[in-house]
C-alpha cells in the first residue's frame, strides 16, 4: 500500500462529513487524489513503470466516476470538494 495508516487517517479526518465517516464521496475522492499524487511523483523517477501506470489510470477513472456521482446528487458539495482539493483550474 502506498499510504501509511497515519497518512490515510489524516486524510479521512480532514474530509469526513461526520465522525467515523470513511465512505462518503468526499473521503473517497480525497484518498484517491492522495494516491494519484503519489504515483504522479513516482513516475517522474520511474518512467518505464507501465504496470503501475495502468493502476493510476484506473484510479483516475474511479475518481472521475465518484465526482460525477457527487455532482449529480449535490452540486454545492461537488464544487466545495473541487476547490478544497484544487483539481480543476
UniProtKB/Swiss-Prot annotation:
Belongs to the universal ribosomal protein uS15 family. It comes from the Bacteria. Part of the 30S ribosomal subunit. Forms a bridge to the 50S subunit in the 70S ribosome, contacting the 23S rRNA. GO terms for cellular component: cytosolic small ribosomal subunit. Keywords: Ribonucleoprotein, Ribosomal protein, RNA-binding, rRNA-binding. One of its GO terms (biological process) is translation. InterPro entries: Ribosomal_uS15, Ribosomal_uS15_bac-type, uS15_NS1_RNA-bd_sf. One of the primary rRNA binding proteins, it binds directly to 16S rRNA where it helps nucleate assembly of the platform of the 30S subunit by binding and bridging several RNA helices of the 16S rRNA. This is Small ribosomal subunit protein uS15. It comes from Maridesulfovibrio salexigens (strain ATCC 14822 / DSM 2638 / NCIMB 8403 / VKM B-1763) (Desulfovibrio salexigens). One of its GO terms (molecular function) is structural constituent of ribosome. HAMAP family: Ribosomal_uS15_B (MF_01343_B). PROSITE patterns: RIBOSOMAL_S15.
Amino acid at each position: 500500500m502506498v499510504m501509511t495508516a497515519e497518512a490515510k487517517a489524516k486524510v479521512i479526518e480532514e474530509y469526513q462529513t461526520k465522525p467515523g465517516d470513511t465512505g462518503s464521496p468526499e473521503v473517497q475522492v480525497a484518498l484517491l487524489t492522495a494516491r494519484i499524487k503519489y504515483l504522479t511523483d513516482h513516475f517522474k523517477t520511474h518512467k518505464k513503470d507501465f504496470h503501475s501506470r495502468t493502476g493510476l489510470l484506473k484510479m483516475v477513472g474511479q475518481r472521475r466516476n465518484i465526482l460525477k456521482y457527487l455532482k449529480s446528487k449535490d452540486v454545492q458539495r461537488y464544487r466545495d470538494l473541487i476547490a478544497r482539493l484544487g483539481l480543476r483550474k
